[in-house]
Amino acid sequence: MKVISRCDESPAGTAARATVTSRKFGFVAVTIMLAALVSVHSAFAARRHHAAAAAADASEENAASASNAALGAYSEACVLEPTTGTVIFESPNAHAPWPTASLAKMMLMLIVAEKIHDGSLKLTDNVTTSAKAAEMGGSQVYLKEGETFSLDDMMKAVVVHSANDASVAVAEYIAGSTDAFVVMMNQQAAAIGMKDSHYYSVHGLPPAKGQQADVASAYDQAILARELLKYPDVIRWSSIDTAPFRAGTFILRNTNHLVRTYPGCDGLKTGFYDKAGFNVVATAKRNDLRLIAVVLGSQHKLTNFKEASEMLSQGFLNYEIEQVAKKGAPITQSVALTDADTASIKPIWGGDAGVFVKRGGANNGIKVDYNLPPSVAAPVKAGQQIGTANVTAEGKSVATIALLAPSDVAKSSSMTKRLLSIF
């Protein structure tokens, strides 16, 4: 379903409009669903069907707005459970490339987060603003050439305020130039399986004459979001509502309204320019379940937030994580001890395990198989691995979790052994 652009502006005109607008503005899981997916997909689709039916009943004088409603509130969408990568809803064209606008910055976020994780970057690194960065238009924090901020502060400006000048400064700091950084972005996209995407900039601004727009499908944006969620710094940045910048003389305000209005929402990113429409990649967590919702090409500022929140709510209403194992809790079986004063020990779970299931399902085919030895010889150290447990659901392996000794077990003394032999 194709969104209708407000007008076919020139790149310069679009950029000018974008400038004005932007300144205003651990569980392991597996899917158990066949019929379940169909039913929830139908629930998502039903909302769009009812919207189209309502549009058909509209009067002629409201024909234009009714036509827009019939076309749908967005161009494409996708809802994904990140632990398993399960798609629980996608629009028919969820794999079609779509202009990213500032969602392009999500790839910058991923590269930065990975480099912080592997130690090649530090949050305390000083990033200096180049002349090119200082000249950036659109959403910005008005960096001056030569001005220096920590990488952490620059990333807050990128993620919270969608600052184009900070994006350029960070990209240049990492790769030496924005062109070199764009190469890194496309390499990373290919590495994580984004097949319907291509980046031409580090910021996602409307392309100038002769340039091409950054594009990614709704599904690819969900894949990217899934990768981002592996890094705590990303959620720390994207969950910020407001934050001071430049010693409090500038206040960053999150462009993602859902951080303020949707319970459990803590990210991730928004993007807009005329031909891209309003884009949002949102994530929320309730209890043990996290979901990602991508809505691209909305024609009205708040429509994308409304659609994303409704999609998330449908997901939370229909699915849950069924806990199978909790780290530190004892399992139901015991293991015999030899050369010890006690007869046996009951191993504990070495990690958490859960299964992504349809709410209200039967037992969802969940099974736990313990792999334990007949006995273990003392001494035993607390945390020592005793065996493993394999969690399956409908015959598919969900996780293999280590089973650990809950405490130290000393070897029996010679006197104890003699007494035991007597009795």
Model-inferred region functions:
Residues 40-45:
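Sec/Tat signal peptide C-region and signal peptidase I cleavage site
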Residues 46-223, 228-232:
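Active-site-adjacent loops and short helices of periplasmic peptidoglycan-processing enzymes
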Residues 1-22:
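N-terminal secretory signal peptides that target proteins for export/translocation
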